[in-house]
Amino acid sequence: QHLKEAFPQAAILIVSVGDRDYKTEEGELRTMPGIKNLVRYQQNLAADEAVAFWNMFEAMGGEGSMADMVHAKPSLANYDYTHINFRGGKHLAGLLYESLIYGKEQYDRRRAYYEEEP
């Protein structure tokens, strides 16, 4: 809310947290217990404040995706199962860019449709 008041003409995009894994007592990698709740909270906050939201957790592949990024060839994330690396950042940046372009195209189509109506 403070940012919207301070910069009323600015477009605001909330990017959710990504996946983050931990090892269970059995040694299995799992998404940390609070990640999905945090993503939902961020999504609700964006909706409540009428700002854009991009779900990086889902863009990464959802639950367990951090391990997939770590073990990708070449690796897209670090072996701490928390942080993406440069290649992973470049990959996710491309996905965000595609989402923004798609959203702009949909906006332009809707706008053209409503401008055509009598």
Task: Please tell me what each predicted stretch does.
Residues I14-V15:
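Structural beta-sheet core signal
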Residues D19-P118:
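Catalytic His-Asp segment of secreted/periplasmic serine-dependent ester chemistry enzymes
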Residues A6-A11:
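A short helix->loop->beta-strand "cap" motif at the edges of active sites that frequently abuts
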